[in-house]
Swiss-Prot record:
Protein name: Phosphoribosyl-ATP pyrophosphatase
Keywords, alphabetical: Amino-acid biosynthesis, ATP-binding, Cytoplasm, Histidine biosynthesis, Hydrolase, Nucleotide-binding
PANTHER family per record: HISTIDINE BIOSYNTHESIS BIFUNCTIONAL PROTEIN, HISTIDINE BIOSYNTHESIS BIFUNCTIONAL PROTEIN HISIE
Swiss-Prot/TrEMBL GO biological process terms: L-histidine biosynthetic process
Origin species: Dinoroseobacter shibae (strain DSM 16493 / NCIMB 14021 / DFL 12)
GO cellular component, one term: cytoplasm
Catalytic activity: 1-(5-phospho-beta-D-ribosyl)-ATP + H2O = 1-(5-phospho-beta-D-ribosyl)-5'-AMP + diphosphate + H(+)
Family listed: Belongs to the PRA-PH family.
Cystine bridges: none
Enzyme class, broadest EC rank: hydrolase
Listed Pfam families: PRA-PH
Length: 102
C-alpha cells in the first residue's frame, strides 16, 4: 500500500470523528467548502516556494498540498482510485488533444 493510500485510509477513518480529536476530523467537520479553501491556501504556498526556489520548503508545501487534496476529495466522497484512474485514462494522450475532448 502506498503512502498516499495509507493517508487516504487515515483520512477516511477520521471522517465523522470528534472534531476535537484531530486536525483532519476538524477540517472535515467544517465541510467541503472549508476543505477546498484550505487546499487552495496550501497550493498558493507551494507556488510561492516554487518561485522562490527553496527545495526543502517546496517539498514540505507539496506534501501539505497532497494531504489537503486528499481531505478535499474525502469531503466530496471522491476516492484516490478515481483520480488515479482518470490519470491512467489520460496517459499517453497529448494534453492538447485531451483538453479538446472535454
Amino acid at each position: 500500500m502506498s503512502v498516499l493510500a495509507r493517508l487516504e485510509a487515515t483520512i477516511a477513518a477520521r471522517k465523522g470523528a470528534d472534531p476535537d480529536s484531530s486536525w483532519t476530523a476538524k477540517l472535515l467537520a467544517k465541510g467541503p467548502e472549508k476543505c477546498a479553501e484550505k487546499f487552495g491556501e496550501e497550493a498558493v504556498e507551494a507556488i510561492i516556494e516554487a518561485v522562490k526556489g527553496d527545495r526543502a520548503k517546496l517539498t514540505s508545501e507539496a506534501a501539505d498540498v497532497l494531504y489537503h487534496l486528499l481531505v478535499m476529495l474525502a469531503a466530496r466522497d471522491v476516492a484516490l482510485a478515481e483520480v488515479l484512474a482518470e490519470l491512467e485514462r489520460r496517459e499517453g494522450i497529448s494534453g492538447i488533444s485531451e483538453k479538446a475532448s472535454r
